[in-house]
């Protein structure tokens, strides 16, 4: 008879107590293992963000480069939109699984869920990126896109990022 084992370590709490980049990394690692298309889009998106950031830095010495920013923005929106769509779907699917598992573990006393908090909505991505160009040029970095997304972990309506870490059991449930 086989038994499923889930390893849980204190480092797993980093998904909750550390910053948004840790939560994005967790979701991205899971999605990259499940979906090669997501991996492809994420790799291209990250390369474009890096190229765009380099361009923003280079524009300080050569302002004429601003004309090429729109080309990078179009690619950023194209790959970034696919990332946003897939993350939304992944969180919806994960919530269905977590709900059933946690219901059995807790006897239905509480509901848990993950909430996806995209930095930008799909229908606003292009305009927000365009409107951020001047700010991005001053900061020399891209300030809009899925590389700024976050995820909340909710028990009932309480965001457990804001509660004592000694009471957290969500990472165990989400890894089952």
State where each predicted segment sits.
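Nucleotide-state sensing region of NTPase/ATPase domains
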Residues: 1-22, 27-38, 95-100, 128-134
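Conserved NTP-handling cores and scaffolds of large molecular machines
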Residues: 3, 31-38, 49, 56, ...
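Long, charged N-terminal accessory/stalk domains
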Residues: 14-15, 21-67, 74
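Conserved NTPase motor "head" modules and their coupling/switch loops across ABC/AAA+ ATPases, GTPases
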Residues: 60-168, 174
């Amino acid at each position: 008879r086989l038994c499923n084992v889930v390893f849980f370590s204190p480092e797993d709490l980093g998904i909750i107590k550390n910053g948004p980049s840790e939560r994005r990394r967790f979701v991205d690692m899971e999605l990259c293992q499940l979906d090669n298309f997501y991996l492809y889009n994420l790799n291209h998106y990250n390369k474009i963000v890096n190229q765009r950031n380099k361009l923003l830095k280079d524009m300080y010495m050569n302002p004429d480069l601003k004309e090429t920013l729109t080309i990078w923005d179009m690619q950023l929106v194209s790959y970034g939109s696919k990332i946003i769509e897939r993350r939304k779907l992944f969180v919806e699917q994960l919530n269905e699984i977590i709900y059933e598992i946690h219901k059995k573990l807790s006897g239905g006393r509480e509901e848990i869920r993950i909430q996806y908090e995209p930095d930008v909505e799909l229908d606003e991505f292009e305009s927000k990126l365009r409107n951020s160009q001047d700010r991005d040029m001053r900061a020399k970095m891209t300030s809009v896109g899925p590389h700024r997304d976050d995820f909340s972990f909710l028990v009932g309506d309480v965001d457990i990022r804001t509660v004592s870490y000694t009471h957290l059991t969500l990472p165990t449930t989400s890894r089952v």
